[in-house]
Amino acid sequence: MNAKNPVLWISLFVIALFAGLSVTRAQSGAQPDVVTAISNLENDAVRANLTGDPAFYQKVLAEDWTRGDSDGTFYTKADILKLMADTKNLKTNSEKLSELKVRVYGNTAVATYKDTYDIMIMGERRAHTIIATDTFVKMGSAWKQVASRGSEAK
């Protein structure tokens, strides 16, 4: 290849540019489906909380999932399933998500949102609005939540 041949270099640049655009188009074309899937999972989590449905979390949370809660506690998947099984010590009275945004990075998606809830947990009433971040990874054909973090909103 002759470095002094500008036509050759321009041609290679144009080919690389179009190849890059094709990949970008393919990824962004898939994003609306992923955004919808993750948004649905977030809204399904609210329904699971309101109905006390641990099966949802058994299915959606990765085995090594963790959550850093707004009260400074870390929870594991086993902790959440145990809490949900004890309906005497966990009841969601109300919950509503707002400002839900989903960003997709290949097989990873990050959801951020505000969560306003009123719950009874271990005999303590908590009524707060938090800002939260959930991280999902595509594992096989399913999206699994691998991490979550919530902090009280100001």
Residue ranges and their predicted role:
Residues 1-5:
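N-terminal secretory signal peptides that target proteins for export/translocation
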